[in-house]
Amino acid sequence: VIILSKKSKSWAWQSFIIAHEIGHCALGHIDPDEILIDETLGEQSYALDDPDVDEQAADQYAITLLNGRANATYGNSTGNMSALGLADAAMQYGKANRVDPGHVVLNFAKHNDAWALGMAAIKLLQAGEKPAGIVVNDLLWRCIRPDVLPDDTIDLLYRVAPAE
């Protein structure tokens, strides 16, 4: 079970975190009965800057999974781009290469130290869409059986994944 606790409305952020956590599972970083809590969910959770070898490997796994290739980076040769321009370029690239445009934007933001621009482009890409957390949490609470879980587990789930 992967619980998304990053308070981001971005589908791209949430898909990266899921891919990162799947990486931990696929790479054998956790035992079947072990609970893993990834507490660093800021920019570094995307940046490959965490000094922990397992975290770097899970990040690399996620980037490869989301791009279909390892070590993917996206840059800007013009040096001057608007949020709309970045969103449009990411959408075109994403369609042509079957890569989520939001992931292209996050990757671009990290590698070009352009987080404000990236977050503005993410908002444009997600215009009119429900925030990721609302949809994911709704699915969790529709599928989970609280009657078979301990009360402290249910309390934790309500704190990290509140029902809307």
PLM region spans:
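Active-site hotspot residues in diverse enzymes, especially metal/ion-binding acidic/histidine motifs
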Residues: 1-164
